[in-house]
């Protein structure tokens, strides 16, 4: 399936919701530290997570450790700075979808590393500032899975 990457996430319920999305879709979740919470935070548990859902979660000490450990072939960043809509590209099996922290988004050095050709945005009304992280991750995962014909779903 796909890999969801949360760079320095800050809000536990968002991460909890994304863990559930990963469990429901077969995605693997990568959390890049520092995190704005502890992984045993009860607010993560409020998302109704079962023990088995945690099997898809991997933590990395920082961005460089993530790149070294995963050696991702293709990264897609989600940002309000994106020049392409999320549905205008072909997302493939094993691709990595990278999201920034809730209050500040991805830093410029990561957007540059990924390259701006792979920085996507989700359409919003002009006066909207940003989407909730867990909502944006859900939109992206289901669009990517749709492109694969919802392979493996029931």
UniProtKB/Swiss-Prot annotation:
Highest taxon listed in the record's lineage: Bacteria
EC number in record: 2.1.1.207
Any one Gene Ontology BP term: wobble position uridine ribose methylation
Principal localisation: cytoplasm
Keywords on record: Cytoplasm, Methyltransferase, S-adenosyl-L-methionine, Transferase, tRNA processing
Stored Pfam families: SpoU_methylase (PF00588)
InterPro entries: Alpha/beta_knot_MTases, SpoU_MeTrfase, TrmL, tRNA_m1G_MTases_N
Keyword Cytoplasm: yes
Disulfide bonds, paired cysteine numbers: none
Binding site for S-adenosyl-L-methionine: 78, 100, 122, 130
Annotated localization: Cytoplasm
Record field: catalytic activity: cytidine(34) in tRNA + S-adenosyl-L-methionine = 2'-O-methylcytidine(34) in tRNA + S-adenosyl-L-homocysteine + H(+); 5-carboxymethylaminomethyluridine(34) in tRNA(Leu) + S-adenosyl-L-methionine = 5-carboxymethylaminomethyl-2'-O-methyluridine(34) in tRNA(Leu) + S-adenosyl-L-homocysteine + H(+)
Coiled-coil boundaries: none
Database matches in CDD domains: SpoU-like_TrmL (cd18094)
GO cellular component: cytoplasm
The keyword Methyltransferase is annotated on this UniProt entry: yes
Gene Ontology MF terms: RNA binding; tRNA (5-carboxymethylaminomethyluridine(34)-2'-O)-methyltransferase activity; tRNA (cytidine(34)-2'-O)-methyltransferase activity
Subunit structure and binding partners: Homodimer.
HAMAP family: tRNA_methyltr_TrmL
UniProt similarity note: Belongs to the class IV-like SAM-binding methyltransferase superfamily. RNA methyltransferase TrmH family. TrmL subfamily.
Role this protein plays: Methylates the ribose at the nucleotide 34 wobble position in the two leucyl isoacceptors tRNA(Leu)(CmAA) and tRNA(Leu)(cmnm5UmAA). Catalyzes the methyl transfer from S-adenosyl-L-methionine to the 2'-OH of the wobble nucleotide.
Classification via PANTHER family: TRNA (CYTIDINE(34)-2'-O)-METHYLTRANSFERASE (PTHR42971:SF1)
Protein name: tRNA (cytidine(34)-2'-O)-methyltransferase
Organism: Saccharophagus degradans (strain 2-40 / ATCC 43961 / DSM 17024)
Record lineage: Bacteria, Pseudomonadati, Pseudomonadota, Gammaproteobacteria, Cellvibrionales
Chain's gene name: trmL
